C-alpha cells in the first residue's frame, strides 16, 4: 500500500440485507449471511492500489448485518467545486476527466465497475489530483444483490442501468437476473459530472427522482443529448462557448446507446486528450516481495543526494503505509463504531418506538414506521489520528529508520528505549497490544523483509523475540524459505479440471474453521478449493487426507489475497514437518511418528507415561489429528498463530515437544482418571494456555538430545550449499545443527516393531560424545546448550559386567551390571552407584551396553521407577569403540 502522506482515513457504514432464519441452501446448511459474503468479496479491493483510487483498508462486521468500511479519504471533492456555482476552466475539466479515466481504466483491468460515480465520490487531494472513492461498493455487494438500497445516484445513472430497474431475488434460489453494469455505464456518469463542471451547476435539481429517471430514458428519442441537456437547464450559451475538444468529449461520454459509447480505456486514447496525456506518467505497480520481476528495477537515486531529504518533515508516521497507520490506530484505542456514534451516523432507537400500531394473528403488521437504517447513509467520517500521534509523540525519528547493520537494531532506538527493552520481556499478548512496541517491530520487520533473502539470518533472529501480527504472513514465508516466481508456478497448475478429490474437498471446506468470518465466506471457500486442489494436483505422489484443509487454513487466512503465497508456504511446510504423511498408505509413517511421541512422553514424564500405558490410552487414540494437522484441527486460529510462530523456528521434531507440553497441562486430570474419562476429555479438549505451552515446549526441546527424535521416515537432509544469505546457525532452541551429515556415529534405522518394544528413546554416539564433551569437534557442538559450569550434562550408566567395564568404558560412566541391577520386586539393588543414580534423577541418563534387549529392559525399569530423561545409546558400546574414547582405569598397585 502507498504511504498515508497528506491523506486521511475515513469510515462509512451500511447494512447488508438480512436473510430469513428458517431457510437453508441447496447443500442443506444455513444460508451464509450477506454481510459475510460482502466481507469476503471486499478483501480483493485492498490489493487495488493506484494514485487515482482511494485505498481500501479494512471492513468490520457489527451487529444486525452492519458493515463498516475503512478507506483512504480526502476532505475536498468535486462537490465543493460545484458549490461555488462557477464554470470550471476547460483545461481543468480535461485534466479531471483524464485522471478519473485513469482510475476507471485501472479498476476495469481488475474487473471492477464503479457504478456510484458522483461529484462527492470524486475526491481531491492536497495537490488537487483526483481520487475515486467508494469504487468497490458495487463489487462487494454482488452488484447490489446483498443490500436493500440501489448502487448509484439517480442523476448520474446511465440510461441502460435505469432501464433494467432494480432486481431483487426473494426466494434465495438461483434465478435469471439482468447482466451487471459494465465500464461504459461509468463513462455516462462521468459525462454528466463533466457537464455540471462546465456549466457550474448541478443537473435535475428541480425534478423529483421519478421525473429524473423518465427524462434520462427519453433522451433515446433526441438527436443531440448535449444540446437537450443544455436547453433543459438554460445553459446553452455556456455549452456553445466550450472548445471543440471538450464538446467532443462530452458527446462521446453522453452517447445514449452503450454499444456506441466508448469504454474508459478507449476514451483515454482519444485525440481529445492529446495535450493532456503527455503530462502524466503511466502508473507501474511496485514489484511485490515474492514476484519474478526485479524489485530494484525502478530504484534510481537522484544526482544530488541531498534532494532525497528535501521534502522530509517531522511527520514520520505519514511515511508509513495506510494499512500500518490503521493497525496502530486500532491499537491506540481507535473504535470505529464509537467514531460513527459520535457523528450520529449510528443512532440507537428505543425498542418501544419500533413496535407496530396494529398486528394481525398471521403476523401482518400496520402502522410501523419504515426502518431507514437499512438504507445507505453516504456520509464518510474522518478518523482522527490525534490519539495515535499523542501516543507516539515520544518516538524519535530514528526509530522509523533503524540501522539494519547495527547489532543493537533488534530494539530500535527511541526516547523510551528502556521501556521498549522492558516491553520485550512482557507476555506476548501484552506486547501485541502495545502501540509503540508494535510500531518498532513492524518497521524493523518491514525493512528486513524488503531485504529478503539477503537478511534471512536477521529475520530468524528477530522472529525468536516475536513476530508482529501485521507482518506474520510474509515472515512465515521467509522462515519457510519461500523464494522464486511463486505466482507463475501457481498459475501454471490446473485448478479447474475435475479430479476424484473434488468431492471430499467440497465436504471438508464448510467444516473448516467456519467460526472465522473470512474463511466462512463464499470467497474464502473458493480460495480454499483452489489452493487445496493446486496442492493435490502438483503432488501426484501424495493424496488428499482429511485434515489437509485445516493445515491450509492459517496460510490462507494470512495470505487471503495471495493464493500463490499461501500455496507456496503450504508446499514448504508439509515436507519439513509432515514428510510423507500424505502418502496413500501412510500407516508406517504415522506409526513411527506416534511411537517416537510415546517415547518422548516416557522421556519427559515417566509417571504420566506409565499411567497412560496402564489404562491403554495410547497416542493412536488422540494424537493423530494433532500431528496430521500440526494442531490446526484442535486449536482456533489465534492460538495456532502463536504456536506456529515458534514451531517454524524449530525443526521437524519440535511438534513432539508441543504434544508433551499439552499433555503436561492436562497432567493432573489424566493421572486422576481412567480410560473412559480420558477419551471424554480429549473429545472436547479443555482450554490450553498457548503461551505456557510454547514456553514449556522450548524447555522440553532443550532437554531432548537431537537424535532422540530420529525417524527414518523424516525428510532426508538437504545437501549444504547455502554459502550466502542462508541460515547458517542452528534453530534457536535446538541442539540440532541444521541437517547434519550422516556419519558412522549417527543413529541407525531399526524395524518399527523393535522401536515399539522400547519404552525409552535411543540417542546416537554423536550426541553422547557431544554431551559428555569427550572431544572438541566443531561439527557436533550444540550452541544453545553451552554452559560454563563444570557439572556433567548427563550420566552414562554402563550395564555390562564389571570385567567388560574394566577393559574399557566411557569416561565418567558408572557401572551397574544388568544381571544384578534389580531385585525381584523391581527395585534397584543397593550398591556403590545407587546414590549417584538417585542424585542424577532429573538429568539425562544414558544406558550403555552391548546387548540391545538388556539396555531396553534396564531403561524400562528406570521409567517404571519414574526416572525422567532416560535414553539408550544406539548401537551400544560397540559404536564408541572405534572412536578411541574408551578409557581404562589405572591399575591399583
UniProtKB/Swiss-Prot annotation:
Residues 710-749 are annotated as: Disordered. Residues 466-651 form the Rab-GAP TBC domain. One of its GO terms (molecular function) is ATP binding. Gene3D superfamilies: putative rabgap domain of human tbc1 domain family member 14 like domains, Rhodanese-like domain, Transferase(Phosphotransferase) domain 1, Ypt/Rab-GAP domain of gyp1p, domain 3. It is found in: Cytoplasm; Cytoplasm, Cytoskeleton, Spindle; Midbody; Early endosome. Changing residue 503 to I: In a colorectal adenocarcinoma sample; somatic mutation. One of its GO terms (cellular component) is early endosome. It comes from the Eukaryota. Residues 720-729 have a biased composition (Low complexity). Keywords: Cytoplasm, Cytoskeleton, Disease variant, Endosome. GO terms for biological process: actin cytoskeleton organization; cell population proliferation; regulation of TOR signaling. CDD domains: RHOD_Kc. SMART domains: RHOD, TBC. InterPro entries: Kinase-like_dom_sf (IPR011009), Prot_kinase_dom (IPR000719), Rab-GAP-TBC_dom (IPR000195), Rab-GAP_TBC_sf (IPR035969), Rhodanese-like_dom (IPR001763), Rhodanese-like_dom_sf (IPR036873). Residues 1-273 form the Protein kinase domain. Component of the FERRY complex (Five-subunit Endosomal Rab5 and RNA/ribosome intermediary). The FERRY complex directly interacts with mRNAs and RAB5A, and functions as a RAB5A effector involved in the localization and the distribution of specific mRNAs most likely by mediating their endosomal transport. The complex recruits mRNAs and ribosomes to early endosomes through direct mRNA-interaction. Also involved in the modulation of mTOR signaling and expression of mTOR complex components. Involved in the control of actin-cytoskeleton organization. Component of the FERRY complex composed of five subunits, TBCK, PPP1R21, FERRY3, CRYZL1 and GATD1 with a ratio of 1:2:1:2:4, respectively. It is linked to Hypotonia, infantile, with psychomotor retardation and characteristic facies 3: An autosomal recessive neurodevelopmental disorder characterized by profound developmental disability, intellectual disability and severe hypotonia. Many patients have seizures, and show brain atrophy, dysgenesis of the corpus callosum and white-matter changes on neuroimaging. Non-specific facial dysmorphism is noted in some individuals. The protein kinase domain is predicted to be catalytically inactive. This is TBC domain-containing protein kinase-like protein. It comes from Homo sapiens.
